[in-house]
Amino acid sequence: MKILRKNHPLLKIINHSFIDLPTPSNISSWWNFGSLLGMCLVIQILTGLFLAMHYTSDTTTAFSSVAHICRDVNYGWLIRYLHANGASMFFICLFIHVGRGIYYGSYVLSETWNIGIILFLTTMATAFVGYVLPWGQMSFWGATVITNLLSAIPYIGSTLVEWIWGGFSVDKATLTRFFAFHFILPFIIAAFALVHLLFLHETGSNNPSGLNSDSDKIPFHPYYTTKDLLGIFLLLLVLMILALFFPDILGDPDNFTPANPLNTPAHIKPEWYFLFAYAILRSIPNKLGGVLALVLSILILAAFPLLNISKQHGLIFRPVTQIIYWIFIANLLVLTWIGGQPVEYPFTTIGQIASITYFTIIIILIPVSNTIENNIIKL
């Protein structure tokens, strides 16, 4: 009898992706974060679906509907906090996943890498529109400030902002369309994630040594399914600790106040996972320049395959670039910290230095260190 999973038209696809997939035998736990991102997406879609059953996207009732979910719906408080903190877990996994891709040179698989960048941008868009939905003070003013950035685009900026708002300010029309976007985007992310996997399985996965591993492959199941399961259990453990013991630790206190267009919060800031980009935006005094820097802070990831001139794959045997990489990570943490600080001395100066360092490392220092290491190999 033929094995069903190898011959059935649908099961065959699953088999080649998750069961009989030839996988390098030496991939470490840093490769777990792809499956963890998949798990985060499933959690977000499921919890979001149950929240959407009780949420109303109207400016007069949105805030009270969130309060109703937490107070009156069975385990509504848990679903809400799993969804809110699940977003933070999603971005933690996302940052580690991208960081691992940079460290181990996964950007040489350019199609997979570029779809990954699209996924990153789509996830950021989803998180942004989702943050507006509770209609608290920070939701409202965050939406106002960030959407207003589009007015920096020459000629069409103001029209574009009013088109997105659906009026002359952030109001009912904005909230309704943001809810619609927040509902549909995760499914688009899921579709892109499948394309991401498709391209990855065309070339095969990278491995920590950066060497060709064709001669040393093992089946994905049971070796990496069990390894992924361990990662998933650890992720769920951290998520449950966050949701049950520290549910509001990553939120903003201003969001416990209903949105009020007549009262501006002292410090408008986005969620913690956007702070690095927000710090870069604020570091440039010119509005259009700030918006361009903000967009480039993410799109510069697409430059990694173009700027790669190293003769070695990944940073495992490249000590000079390793040092620069860890300076880059430290710099990102500094930017995240600065993004949450008020716009005053010395924070503005530190932010400007960190922003310049961010782009300098990627555009200048990494290619220079690649050249140095290439010359060392020749010695």
Swiss-Prot record:
Note: Heme 1 (or BL or b562) is low-potential and absorbs at about 562 nm, and heme 2 (or BH or b566) is high-potential and absorbs at about 566 nm.
Binding residues annotated for heme b b562, in chain numbering: 83, 182
GO biological process assignments: mitochondrial electron transport, ubiquinol to cytochrome c
Disulfides per UniProt: none
Bilayer topology term: Multi-pass membrane protein
Obligatory cofactor(s): heme b
Segments passing through the bilayer: 33-53, 77-98, 113-133, 178-198, 226-246, 288-308, 320-340, 347-367
InterPro entries: Cyt_b/b6_C (IPR005798), Cyt_b/b6_C_sf (IPR036150), Cyt_b/b6_N (IPR005797), Cytb/b6-like_sf (IPR027387), Cytochrome_b (IPR030689), Cytochrome_b_C_euk/bac (IPR048260), Cytochrome_b_N_euk/bac (IPR048259), Di-haem_cyt_TM (IPR016174)
Cell compartments where the protein resides: Mitochondrion inner membrane
Residues annotated as binding a ubiquinone: 201
One Pfam family this sequence matches: Cytochrome_B
Domain of life: Eukaryota
Principal location listed in the UniProt entry: mitochondrion
Keywords annotated in UniProt: Electron transport, Heme, Iron, Membrane, Metal-binding, Mitochondrion, Mitochondrion inner membrane, Respiratory chain, Transmembrane, Transmembrane helix, Transport, Ubiquinone
GO molecular function: metal ion binding; ubiquinol-cytochrome-c reductase activity
Naturally occurring in which organism (per UniProt): Akodon reigi
Function: Component of the ubiquinol-cytochrome c reductase complex (complex III or cytochrome b-c1 complex) that is part of the mitochondrial respiratory chain. The b-c1 complex mediates electron transfer from ubiquinol to cytochrome c. Contributes to the generation of a proton gradient across the mitochondrial membrane that is then used for ATP synthesis.
Gene label: MT-CYB
Record protein name field: Cytochrome b
Residues the record lists as binding heme b b566: 97, 196
Cofactor binding note of this UniProt entry: Binds 2 heme b groups non-covalently.
